């Protein structure tokens, strides 16, 4: 049981047991009362050095009290509370039960306390019995009814989940990742090659003697994780840094930095400043090293607690957890929700909004991951029907962009303990989580497990490659867009890496899309790709050669027509807009649009079709304010094939629309 929950139980139990009762005890034995009242004083005598009560002294006095009267239920109650303070919940339950059997005058509220402890250790059957007893009592305090109803709901869910367990066989990630120190909050790149996580390290230079840092590991030649190392001295400091999230290509990292709270200076380590509590920062890898982290600023960060970010693979949306704080020193763990913010056209962040009420509850949500498929959300919560503590859930974005009702990932992945730090691999086969279960290297370790089919994200793959200058072959930093041709919307956008020109873009399956690469002074690159069950990553590295704007001919791969017609399909708009942009920012150039067909059918019909198709493109550009004296069109029919017309694939390549810069 977590320390937070222990303290919660202590507060409510002590209040009702000690101050809610009359001074008239259930016993008339004066010696029993004397020992009991001494025990109360002893229990409330908090040590200045340890911050804890005199547990041993209190326990001895209570044993003496019960020796004088074994039906003195108040003494059993305090003895139960004492074991909560010791962290021994099972013994606390034992003495609570003895209290119940010792007297008929035990208040009904004690059934509420007993049920609270029983669900906290996974004793669901007895919790259900005692919770229902309290629920059905006419003396029940209505203020506790919401919590009692949740205990009943969770107990029923848990009993059913235990009868129908999911396949779950966790495997420790081993000493290259784990240590005797706690490891948690993992993140991974879309190509499954780089792994980030948080480790709480010992540090005698800080007041608490420990702080959090971010570590990194990469796949080696055997596909195993290499020995983890600190990610960078620029990112890590002697303050807390953790809960990192990668952009899909690993070029950007967003992480949490927390201030000390000392002297009101909002210091976040390495000279960084913030807005209070924990803030989100970002850093970019330029191919050689990480840049100095920058605070994301308002409206993302606030005086409250921002943490556990997850960056969408399309580079558009950031999901994170915000916890409301009472003040700089105190945070309410039960007022904690998932928010999201999107990058606007001007490059700023939109005002964060709470994600759907289907996901957020009046209780606690955390450990959010938006999968690279962009549609599947994994998170932890104690507000949905579950096993009693924080459980892991999955929700899917619907066609109308609403979120489905969360699905619990089941027992034994979820248990009466708190589960979080969930991460599902890009291909959906493996899940990662943090646990302090037996057999680890000490404290919290990171584990992997096979994800059941029903909990997997939507299938995706990735496109990996490099952008170079067509003539010099030097790497280029280019801007990328991945567009859905059917809907005409941008699916993903990013730029190739500074220094080496490499890129990695996640690609949804079963979508016909256009890939465009642009750089000022260069002709845009266009490619049409359809992804089905084939993993693009298996096809190797895609080398994109950008040519400087000059006289030359380029294939427009994403111009489409109805079969044997010259009517432009709606899916051509993405490409047409790229040509429009080229003409608009380069007013000095003139172009010829040429149409080509394969060799099927009549030669004359093919020639006329190619002319009409080229003319259709020119007419669209004229309708969009490009001067007609800069535009020319011509049809070549089947006379200029680029491949032999001996296969369906080659014929498709020959059916094309080309753009030729004829004057610059």
Regions found by a protein language model. Name each.
Residues 486-502:
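Short, acidic Ser/Thr/Gly-rich low-complexity loop/linker segments typical of extracellular
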Residues 520-543:
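Structured interaction patches on ligand/partner-binding surfaces of diverse proteins
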């Amino acid at each position: 049981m977590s320390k937070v929950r222990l303290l919660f139980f202590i507060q409510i139990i002590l209040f009702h047991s000690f101050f809610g009762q009359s001074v008239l005890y259930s016993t008339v034995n004066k010696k029993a009362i004397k020992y009991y009242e001494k025990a109360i004083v002893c229990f409330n005598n908090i040590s200045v050095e340890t911050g804890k009560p005199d547990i041993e002294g209190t326990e001895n006095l209570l044993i003496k009290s019960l020796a004088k009267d074994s039906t003195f239920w108040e003494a059993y109650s305090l003895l139960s509370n004492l074991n909560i303070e010791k962290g021994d919940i099972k013994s606390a339950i034992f003495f609570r039960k003895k209290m119940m059997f010792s007297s008929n005058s035990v208040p009904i509220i004690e059934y509420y306390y007993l049920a609270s402890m029983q669900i906290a250790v996974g004793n669901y059957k007895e919790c259900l019995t005692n919770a229902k007893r309290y629920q059905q009592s006419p003396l029940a305090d209505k203020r506790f009814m919401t919590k009692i109803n949740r205990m009943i709901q969770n107990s029923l869910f848990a009993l059913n989940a235990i009868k129908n367990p999911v396949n779950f066989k966790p495997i420790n990630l081993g000493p290259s990742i784990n240590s005797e120190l706690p490891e948690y909050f993992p993140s991974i790149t879309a190509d499954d090659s780089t792994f980030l996580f948080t480790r709480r390290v010992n540090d005698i230079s800080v007041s608490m003697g420990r702080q959090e840092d971010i570590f990194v590991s990469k796949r080696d030649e055997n596909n195993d994780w290499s020995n983890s190392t600190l990610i960078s001295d620029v990112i890590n400091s002697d303050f807390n840094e953790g809960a990192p999230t990668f952009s899909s290509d690993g070029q950007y990292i967003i992480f949490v930095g927390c201030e000390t709270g000392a002297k009101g200076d909002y210091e976040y380590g390495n000279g960084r400043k913030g807005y209070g509590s924990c803030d989100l920062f970002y850093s970019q890898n330029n191919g050689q090293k990480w840049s100095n982290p920058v605070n994301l600023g308002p409206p993302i960060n606030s005086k409250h607690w921002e943490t556990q970010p997850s960056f969408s693979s399309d580079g558009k949306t950031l999901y994170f957890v915000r916890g409301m704080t009472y003040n700089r020193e105190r945070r309410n763990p039960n007022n904690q929700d998932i928010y999201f913010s999107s990058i606007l056209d001007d490059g700023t962040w939109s005002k964060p909004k709470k994600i759907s009420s289907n996901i957020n509850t009046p209780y606690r949500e955390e450990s959010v991951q938006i999968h690279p498929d962009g549609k599947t959300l994994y998170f932890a919560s104690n507000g949905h029907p579950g096993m009693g503590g924080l459980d892991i859930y999955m929700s899917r974005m619907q066609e109308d962009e609403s979120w489905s009702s969360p699905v619990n990932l089941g027992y034994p992945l979820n248990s009466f303990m708190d589960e979080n730090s969930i991460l599902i691999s890009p291909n959906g086969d493996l899940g990662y989580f943090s646990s302090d279960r037996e057999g680890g290297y000490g404290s919290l370790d990171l584990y992997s497990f096979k994800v059941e089919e029903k909990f997997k994200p939507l299938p995706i793959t990735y496109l990996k490659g490099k952008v170079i200058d067509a003539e010099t072959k030097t790497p280029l930093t280019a801007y990328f867009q991945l567009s859905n041709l059917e809907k005409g919307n941008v699916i993903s956008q990013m730029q190739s890496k500074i220094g080496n020109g490499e890129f990695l873009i996640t690609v949804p399956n079963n979508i016909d899309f256009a890939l465009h690469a642009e750089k000022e002074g260069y002709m845009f690159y266009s490619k049409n790709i359809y992804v089905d069950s084939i993993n693009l990553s298996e096809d190797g590295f895609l080398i994109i050669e950008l040519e400087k704007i000059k006289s030359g001919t380029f294939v427009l791969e994403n111009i489409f027509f109805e079969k044997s017609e010259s009517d432009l399909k709606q899916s051509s708009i993405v490409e047409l807009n790229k040509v429009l942009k080229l003409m608009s920012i380069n007013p000095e150039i003139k172009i010829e649009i040429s149409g080509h067909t394969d060799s099927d059918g009549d030669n004359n019909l093919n020639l006329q079709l190619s002319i009409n198709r080229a003319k259709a493109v020119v007419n669209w550009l004229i309708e969009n304010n490009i001067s007609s004296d800069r535009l020319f069109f011509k049809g070549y029919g089947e006379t200029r094939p680029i491949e032999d017309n001996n296969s369906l694939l080659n014929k498709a390549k020959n059916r094309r629309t080309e753009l030729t810069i004829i004057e610059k």
